[in-house]
Curated annotation (Swiss-Prot):
<dbReference type="Pfam" id="PF11987">
    <property type="entry name" value="IF-2"/>
</dbReference>
<dbReference type="GO" id="GO:0003924">
    <property type="term" value="F:GTPase activity"/>
</dbReference>
<keyword id="KW-0547">Nucleotide-binding</keyword>
<comment type="function">
    <text>One of the essential components for the initiation of protein synthesis. Protects formylmethionyl-tRNA from spontaneous hydrolysis and promotes its binding to the 30S ribosomal subunits. Also involved in the hydrolysis of GTP during the formation of the 70S ribosomal complex.</text>
</comment>
<dbReference type="GO" id="GO:0003743">
    <property type="term" value="F:translation initiation factor activity"/>
</dbReference>
<dbReference type="InterPro" id="IPR000795">
    <property type="entry name" value="T_Tr_GTP-bd_dom"/>
</dbReference>
<feature type="compositionally biased region" description="Low complexity">
    <location>
        <begin position="124"/>
        <end position="150"/>
    </location>
</feature>
<feature type="binding site">
    <location>
        <begin position="392"/>
        <end position="399"/>
    </location>
    <ligand>
        <name>GTP</name>
    </ligand>
</feature>
<dbReference type="InterPro" id="IPR000178">
    <property type="entry name" value="TF_IF2_bacterial-like"/>
</dbReference>
<comment type="similarity">
    <text>Belongs to the TRAFAC class translation factor GTPase superfamily. Classic translation factor GTPase family. IF-2 subfamily.</text>
</comment>
<feature type="region of interest" description="G2">
    <location>
        <begin position="417"/>
        <end position="421"/>
    </location>
</feature>
<dbReference type="InterPro" id="IPR009000">
    <property type="entry name" value="Transl_B-barrel_sf"/>
</dbReference>
<feature type="binding site">
    <location>
        <begin position="492"/>
        <end position="495"/>
    </location>
    <ligand>
        <name>GTP</name>
    </ligand>
</feature>
<dbReference type="Pfam" id="PF22042">
    <property type="entry name" value="EF-G_D2"/>
</dbReference>
<dbReference type="InterPro" id="IPR023115">
    <property type="entry name" value="TIF_IF2_dom3"/>
</dbReference>
<dbReference type="InterPro" id="IPR005225">
    <property type="entry name" value="Small_GTP-bd"/>
</dbReference>
<keyword id="KW-0648">Protein biosynthesis</keyword>
Length: 883
């Protein structure tokens, strides 16, 4: 036996630490506390029963509880004097089997600790002690109550109750040995217990009489308490177990009954077959029900599933009565990687449902079909005024030309009408009207084109005679060509001495705009907005172009138009400028525009006058929307309010579904996959660079990459930073933007992220060409990506001896981090790219500086810093390849 702590021994003996400490001190064993270590001989000493006869009442009671338990069974099994005579002789005498049995039971409880001392005591103990001990409990019943308080060791059962005490001794055995629940469940069965004893003890000649003792126990035991409690009593609880009956007959019967019932249940569940007796009818019903389910086939009408627009995988599986995993497996075989919440369109749902014997019926309302414009009879068409948009560089006199045209054709009291910001107005010339749209620059024009709004009939391109073609002029030409709108060029400021109209004509030839004088088809008019020169000629050319286009519309039908612009007015609510394109709009008409509906409550023309109706090509301000519509939305007049609300609600639902499965703009990584699927034949690109030579070289190199599978189109190229206009053009044309030694403006970056436009930035031209080539071949492997950190403006430059120039900066966006990669921009052109050598704030080195603070930044091996420069810091991230 190894060394043991006091608290461990107390736990094994089932007594408190204090009680064990008291007993150890009474035995002369020096211990300090419950953590003290006991040697093997000390453990034997404290667990062994004392040999001296009891001298006082209390001591006698304690000794009785420690030593008599093994012999109390003899006293209980026979008359009071029989144990005295039976115990006195040696172990070999006739009653000895009972005594030996008791010894065996004690050993069974704690074989490692108690077996040696018990064996020695059974051989050498004097006869008087057992006699006195056996007689004493019979004469002193109070000891029975104190017995639970003084158990000396786990193997010795301290209950002085006859047979129950012995049973509890066996119950305590699982607390120490491994098979815990086994003795507890079979407490009343004698044969299993005997087998346990035979496994633990050495062969003993007294094994046979044990059943006789058990029979006697059964005979002398009072009626048992309810068996229910017996089944759930924990083996380590002697108190509860002591009250349980010693008889095992009833327990055996109940246990056997339970086993039989359990086996029957298992057979019914796992091995269904012909049964007799209880449960036969239920099983027969279940079997017959199963057969019916197998042969049942849904009716033809039930095999039709009605869906609207789309349906999720989970919903389709539920309606067909199949598992979603089976449906997903079929879709994966068809090459679709989907989840249970993935929406399926009608075609895909029809295809997969046919695999399971179902049909799909599309019950969706095709709103576009319902609202589609019916072609008009030629006799019902009448001429309509042309819709003209004036575009051009801001400094080239676009606003002045608009003011000059309005002032020449509007009464004096309405000269300031341009400040009403209605966005559209009418001009009359010789009894004919012209509608001008005051769109907010190129951005709105491109946005309307991106939404498919074919509003503008003619574009007037304003170019200053003294400046020539400017970047915004190039963009305006590209926008007009992309929209398929004819262009009339107005060369403004011809009254200036430095005006060179011929140079403007020559520069515009690069874009395919050749003057009629030089054998082309483009109309050029030289005007002066300030001096009112050639304004009538310009309007006549507009009407001439309109006659060539033969613009007509039917006024006698429900109105259709386009939202030019919209706003939320505090007093009037949502207000929109509507350009009526066909039909006539009247007050009181119900309408739908995009996801909004409403009723026309009031209309105003461009001069602010209330009107009751508006015909084709007439711009009016409409009040009565339920919400603010988007520019470019189609405005449709309806007869029924209910129908208008239904259409608006349907569009809102469709918009939500579209946003959930939003189609992102094409990036280089996705190009190869789309080519493989045959979805893309053209790749549009916008090229921006720091010098014109780079623009031309890159554009030409990209055009040479075009093949039969992919045609690469450079739809726009110019010098300068990447602007919001470039992003809008790329979004509308599904193009990518390539930048060389230029950076996007902050607003352009945010807008590109929102629109999903892919912007690629390079320092070397051949890298861009190689990337495009790899993308077309499906070999693009992007591994490095730049992460933008912050932007700072240089407000002061300090010269520090032995260090160089230090830039005093104000952090505009993000944060500056020491030792980060930096880029110095001057007029949005990259001047330097390298590493940040120092970052200080108030002469202290800092790790980073956040937005809104000032700091000093030093660039590694670079001193050419000027006030107004911009410093960007960034870091390079390694991104896993995704194709």
């Amino acid at each position: 036996m190894s060394k043991t702590h006091v608290y461990e021994l107390a736990k094994k003996m089932g007594i408190e630490n204090k009680e064990l400490l008291t007993r150890l001190k009474s035995l002369g064993i020096e211990v300090k506390n419950h953590l003290s270590v006991l040697e093997e001989d000390e453990i034997l000493k404290v667990t062994a029963p004392p040999a001296a006869p009891p001298k006082s009442g209390p001591q006698e009671e304690v000794r009785v509880t420690t030593t008599v338990i093994r012999r109390r069974r003899v006293a209980e099994a026979a008359p009071a004097e029989t144990p005295v005579e039976a115990v006195a002789p040696p172990v070999e005498s006739a009653p000895a089997p009972l005594e030996v049995e008791a010894v065996e039971e004690a050993v069974v409880q704690a074989p490692p600790v108690v077996e040696p001392p018990v064996a020695r005591e059974s051989e050498a103990a004097p006869a008087e002690e057992p006699v006195a001990a056996a007689v004493k409990p019979a004469s002193e019943p109070p000891v029975v109550q104190k017995a639970p308080v003084a158990p000396a060791a786990p193997p010795v059962d301290d209950k002085p109750t006859a047979n129950k005490a012995r049973i509890l001794g066996r119950v305590e055995l699982p607390g120490i040995t491994t098979p815990a629940p086994k003795p507890a469940d079979r407490r009343e069965a004698t044969a299993p217990k005997k087998r346990i004893e035979e496994r633990i003890m050495t062969p003993s000649p007294t094994d046979r009489p044990a059943p006789a003792g058990d029979d006697r126990r059964k005979a002398g035991t009072p009626p048992p308490p309810p068996r229910k409690g017996k089944e759930f009593v924990a083996p380590a609880e002697p108190e509860r177990g002591a009250k349980k009956p010693g008889g095992g007959g009833a327990g055996k019967k109940k246990e056997a009954f339970k086993k039989t019932e359990l086996l029957e249940k298992r057979e019914r569940i796992f091995e269904p077959g012909p049964k007799t007796g209880k449960g036969k009818k239920r099983e027969r019903d279940m079997v017959s029900l199963g057969r019916k389910t197998e042969i049942t086939v849904p009716k033809a009408i039930k095999r039709i599933i009605k869906i609207s627009e789309s349906i999720t995988v989970g919903e389709l599986a539920k309606r067909m009565g199949v598992k979603a995993t089976d449906l997903i497996r079929v879709l994966m075989k068809m090459g679709m990687m989907v989840t249970i919440n993935h929406p399926l369109d009608v075609d895909t749902a029809t295809l997969v449902a046919s695999e399971f014997g179902y049909e799909i019926e599309n019950v969706a309302i095709d709103v576009d079909e319902m609202l589609e414009s019916v072609p008009d009879a030629p006799e019902s068409l009448t001429k309509r005024p042309p819709v003209v948009t004036i575009m051009g560089h801001v400094d080239h006199g676009k606003t002045s030309l608009l003011d000059a045209i309005r002032e020449a054709n509007v009464i004096a009291g309405e000269a300031g009408g341009i400040t009403q910001h209605i966005g559209a107005y009418d001009v009359e010339l010789n009894g004919r009207k012209i509608t001008f749209l005051d769109t907010p620059g190129h951005e709105a024009f491109t946005a309307m084109r991106a939404r498919g709004a074919k509003v503008t009939d003619i574009v007037i391109l304003v170019v200053a005679a003294d400046d020539g073609v400017m970047p915004q002029t190039r963009e305006a030409v590209n926008h007009s060509k992309a929209a398929g709108v004819p262009i009339i060029v107005a060369i403004n400021k011809i009254d200036k001495p430095e005006a060179k109209p011929e140079r403007v004509k020559q520069e515009l030839m690069e874009f395919g705009l050749v003057s009629e004088e030089w054998g082309g088809e483009t109309i050029f008019v030289e005007v002066s907005a300030k001096k009112r020169i050639n304004l009538p000629e310009l309007l006549e050319m507009v009407l001439l172009q309109a006659d060539v286009m033969d613009l007509k519309a039917n006024p006698d039908k429900d109105a259709r138009g386009t939202i030019v612009e919209a706003k939320l007015d505090r007093g009037r609510g949502p207000v929109a400028t509507v350009l009526v394109q066909e039909g006539t709009l009247k007050i009181g008409d119900y309408f739908v525009a995009g996801v909004n509906s409403g009723r026309v409550r009031a209309m105003q023309n461009d001069r602010g006058d209330k009107v009751n109706e508006a015909g084709p090509s007439m711009p009016v301000e409409v009040i009565g929307f339920t919400g603010v519509p988007d520019a470019g939305d189609v405005f449709i007049s309806l007869v029924d309010e209910k129908r208008a609300k239904e259409i608006a609600s349907h569009r809102q639902q469709k918009l939500r579904e579209t946003e959930l499965a939003k189609h992102s703009k094409m990036s280089l990584e996705q190009l190869y996959d789309k080519i493989q699927k045959g979805e893309v034949k053209d790749l549009n690109a916008i090229v921006k660079a720091d010098v014109q030579g780079s623009v031309e070289a890159v554009s030409e190199s990209l055009r040479k990459l075009s093949t039969d599978a992919v045609r690469l189109n450079v739809i726009h190229s110019s010098v300068g930073a990447i602007t919001e206009t470039d992003v809008n053009l790329a979004s509308a044309s599904n193009a990518i933007i390539l930048g060389f030694n230029v950076r996007p403006e902050p607003k352009a970056s945010a807008h590109a992220e929102k629109e999903g436009v892919d912007i690629r930035l390079y320092n070397i031209i051949y890298d861009a060409v190689e990337d495009i080539k790899k993308a077309m071949e499906g070999l693009l492997e992007p591994t490095l990506r730049e992460k933008y950190l912050g932007r700072a403006e240089v407000r002061e430059v300090f010269s520090v001896p032995k260090v160089g120039n230090v830039a005093g900066c104000y952090i505009q966006d993000g944060k500056m981090i020491r030792n980060a990669q930096v880029r110095l921009l001057r007029d949005n052109v990259v001047i330097y790219e390298g590493k940040m050598s120092s970052l200080r704030r108030f002469k202290d080195d800092v790790k980073e500086v956040a937005t809104g603070y000032e700091c000093g930044i030093g660039l590694e091996n670079y001193n050419d810093i000027k006030v107004g420069d911009v410093i960007e810091d960034f870091e390079i991230e390694k991104i896993a390849t995704t194709l």
